[in-house]
Amino acid sequence: MIENKIHVAYGFHVNCYHSYRGDTNDNLGFGSDIRIIRKILDTLTEFNENGIPVKGTWDTENFFSLQKILPEYAPDIIEKMKERVEKYGDENIIMGYNNGALSAMTEDEFCESINLAITNPDGSGLNDIFGTCEKIVRPQEVMFTPSQVSLYNKLGIKALCLYYSCVPFDAFRTIIPRLSDEEAFNPVTYTYNGESMTIIPTYSNSDVCDAGCLRAWVKDLRKKQESGEINNDLFLFINMDADAIFWETIDLGKFTGKVANTDGIHGLVTEIADLPYIVFDTPGGYIKNHKPIGKIEFTHDTADGNFTGYASWSEKPFNRKIWTRIERARAMSKVTSKRDMLSPSFNNRVLLLSTTHFGLATPVLNIQREKTALELSDKVIADEITVMPKAKKITIHNITGSLLQCVQVEIKEKIADISCIKIEAKDLESFVAIPTADDNSSAYLMFKFKKNKKKYDIKINFDGECKKTTFKNLLETPRMSMMFSSNGNIAFVYCDGRKIGGYDFLQSYLTYGKKKFEFNNTGITPLSVGGNGEGVRITGEIHLPKEIKSGSYTFDFFKTDFSDAIFVRTTVDYPYTAETTSISTENSALGRYSDMNWKETVPFQITPTLDGDISVIKRNFMDDISSFRTQSFPECDEKNQKIDSFNHQLTGGFVGLYDENGGIIIANARQVLSSMAHCPMRLEKDKTVRMNPYGTYYGNQRHHFSRAKDEVLEAYTLVAAQGKSIAPSYNGSSETAVFGLYPMAKSGLSDIEKQEICAFADGALITTPENEIIAPFTDDNITLKDANADGIDEKDLKNPVLTGISGNLGKYITKGFKGIAHIITTQIKAK
């Protein structure tokens, strides 16, 4: 309809604390943030003074930016932002106090991150500084998990801003049926488990390029209003990092300011300022007078990292080092405090949950950022240890309310065989002990008790008689069986009498360059197990071309007499190869070298034999269990029949696959090794789904439907820094994990099964007197190769686009040219 308008808002995502740059006021740190934000503010004000009523929408991280960096290095920015709120109608919306991984938080961590962003004792809340803010959240990295709808509603949040984008910097474009333009440019209602909230589809500068230019985009939408195809106002919210080069004018010599999408915020406003149907607005201003148009549902966990998911923050070994420390602190807080937010580690833990301590940087973090993350995570653990109750006896603290208790312990004396362990305790029904180090210096203990108590006193020694182990190549539980071949491969796996795997059930390999290098089994032996269990040990070697150090691995499969699951301890020592590539651009200065020939790390790929409609089941960090269908990808976009990597599955203890007849679940011992989403998956064209716990896949980005025949999508994947493989971060590292393979029946998981799986995953706490032979295990189950600093100076930083072209020149000439031609042609037509 002609009387309808198109409302346009410009959003600036302010976070001066980066994973890909350091902490200095120059281009190696936050200097570019300050430069670009100042220019944005001055440009907006100049427009206002010349009668163009443009407004800015700011989602600014509080602790690092508003409280620390900007007051010290650029207080003028805060003053100008305040002035614009009062004088020109700029709007502040919520990002989160610590630019945190909101979706991977517990309820208390989440609520604190939102509440402190609004107001806090240090005076860095949005209300504290600006006097007001809109209760709209643009979550850092658009991280969202469905069950948090209830918390957002509880906190009075009006809406979420999530990307609906044409490039793999997106939240939900590829996981729902395609929205009409009327819906895509209006708030929509999202519903999960009967609770609803408003989501505002949000766009980036890449989407502007996809449309050719902003003027062409709004003109196209206007035609649909005039024809009656669209009968509502529309809202176009362009939101991008405030340090993005797209906001500032690019020097093109005599063509400066003449090519669309190269003139920064100045060009984006100038292009449309003369159109009578344009209203410059803000998200809060629009939803005040416009109700949601469409309805959407999805159960995937969203984030805007590599492969449109959680890869960038969860698949690096360093991610797991920091995340496992968070998990241990969370577990300890259940013993030290009556409520999580009262625990001694809580405040520092909230800060540690900043996404910056995990990614987006690829393949590794900036060397300074790793240092600060390690220091803060050390403090988080120390905060809890100092107040842990002193033990007069070895005590197991039950933090899950279950009969199953699981802990990792340090063994302080040299022992020859774990099978000689003796454990005594009142109401102890059974136990199993397996080594988590090949030298028996640590062990994983599983206890089954007859009665549910808050804590159990136990006695442990290694004076028992060592068990004689006889080799069996078949592990059987009441519901599972696993057969091993003579060379250590898995021959078959059955769950509830159904074969769900053959020789391809377990595969282990590295992709280096363009070749796949499989792990090489060298031995299969009986596993020495303490207590009532038995197992099989697989050992082998890992080799890569021109390796400086070879790799090795140990896979210990074992069963107990009190569970239907088959459990696994994995230790993988990755080979080390020479690191000679430095990623040092104006956008991403990592300060270190990598070997970019590493493409994929697949240490323990599980491919269950399932049929037809396969779903992912997952548990998040609010203890919510949900699932999504893997065929939702091709159903939403037929070009996504095959997806080389997807990670929409937070792993708060377990993740799995199932079809209409049942499936299999991988439960991970969170206090041994964990990350917010440790298990990427791969969808094959024949509907097969593969799981890659503690690994990372690489390949083609999934398809995002667009207006420009994919020219922008293809160019974006070549130059985006986070689009590189994460695999180089595994070079020379070592990781130990413990997880359980649980059968899932056709009827789903019973409450009893859920309780056992969660008890195994969440674990217990153990406290011991100093003179005992065992102690709580406090070391990391991961070692990383020392970073080799590149010594790059600020003057040596490269153009990020040119760096993206490196190694892809042929592709960039064709795809980049098509993208530029599309922009220029569209710009000419839109005049």
Please tell me what each predicted stretch does:
Residues T60, Y164, A171-L179, P187, ...:
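C-terminal domain-boundary segment and adjacent tail
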Residues N473-E756, G763-A764, V801-G804, L809:
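Beta-strand/loop-rich accessory regions of lumenal/periplasmic or secreted enzymes
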Residues I2, E72, E315-C420, D427-T436, ...:
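Histidine-centered catalytic/metal-binding microenvironments
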Residues I2-K135, V142-I199, R215-N232, H266, ...:
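Catalytic alpha-helical scaffold of carbohydrate-active enzymes acting on polysaccharides/glycoconjugates
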Residues M95, V137, I238, R349:
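Conserved, mostly hydrophobic/aromatic
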Residues D243-K254, I287-N306, F346-Q368, H678-T717, ...:
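Aromatic/acidic polysaccharide-binding cleft in carbohydrate-active enzymes
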